[in-house]
Amino acid sequence: IRTLRNYGSKEKYVNEVKGVNSRLDPLQAAILRVKLKVLDEWTDRRCRIAYIYNELMGSAVELSIPYVPVWAKPVWHLYVVRTANRLTLQSQLTKASIGTLIHYPIPPHKQDAFKDGNEMMLPIADRLSAEVLSLPFGPHLSVENANMIANTCKLCDLLA
């Protein structure tokens, strides 16, 4: 049952069976209820950090930042960049003590949960899963740290 409640996964990003996201227990619900009081503040903070990233990395050549249409006002859960040089960028950021994550390293059509579709050819999904890199992001991040992270990414882009 735990596996089914966690997207059909025992190991992060490895879906063995089809599952759902049903991990909210009463304690987590109580904590989230308290956090709702600062939701607007956190949303504004996330937007500010995304703006900094967009401004500082927007002219990068080897790094693609999230596209945001003029009319859109995203809330921002993650800040995910794309680069064909993901491992190099991740390594350089790690050397600068900047943690990153890869969301999601295995595309859905290659998960065991969808083994009936594993033979599908989805080259765009395959390419994206090899290029995406999530940068540190959230309301906890200071403006100074956001600037440092973006400038480090930009420097790595120039060296690529």
Segments and roles (model prediction):
Residues 1-160:
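PLP-dependent aminotransferase class I/II
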